[in-house]
A protein has these predicted regions:
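Short loop/turn and low-complexity linker motifs enriched in small/turn-promoting residues
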Residues: 1-170
Length: 170
């Protein structure tokens, strides 16, 4: 009724979630919170306050990292992790020896070398002017002795191989 005092029951309020900014180096790491996938870094998430959350960062070729995160109501925080790469040594032998090695499109020097590669799928290219380039997808495996042996063909060799042989009967 208008203009009359009324007694209403108390309305319980729930504490606001905490806001957490998650970052990783390198970026693009997958993130799970308490076992549930939540996205990729960098990502901003709200987490229930007053309890510990298990945040796990994982990215192909890197060691998994986990952090215990506890938020307070309406609190803002940042969690940043540097993921440790998992690498493997690979021996690359190339002919001609002065051909160039590219890993994922980046020049890494002469092709004939021992190199540390991330234990993830990588594109390896070996190039030299006047030769047919070589390209392959390669996954290095830690703990295994691995070698990639490549002999580039000259453009003339490739042209000769592409000529179809015709045999004429007379």
């Amino acid at each position: 009724v208008a203009r009359e005092d009324q007694n209403l029951p108390a309305i319980p309020l729930e504490p606001a979630d905490g806001l957490v900014m998650l970052r990783s180096t390198p970026g693009g790491a997958n993130v799970t919170v308490d076992g549930t996938f939540r996205g990729q870094t960098p990502i901003e998430l709200t987490l229930a306050p007053g309890r510990n959350h298990n945040v796990v960062f994982f990215l192909n070729g890197y060691q998994e990292a986990s952090r215990a995160v506890r938020t307070s109501a309406a609190d803002e925080s940042t969690v940043a992790v540097a993921l440790e790469p998992i690498t493997s040594s690979v021996r690359i032998s190339a002919t001609p020896a002065d051909a160039e090695l590219y890993i994922n499109g980046q020049l890494r020097g002469r092709a004939d070398q021992q190199i540390e590669l991330l234990a993830a799928s990588q594109t390896i290219e070996i190039r030299k002017d006047g030769y047919v380039p070589f390209s392959t997808t390669f996954i290095s495996r830690p703990g295994l002795a691995q070698q990639l042996v490549v002999s580039l063909k000259t453009l003339e060799q490739q042209r000769q191989e592409n000529i179809k042989t015709e045999i004429a009967a007379t």
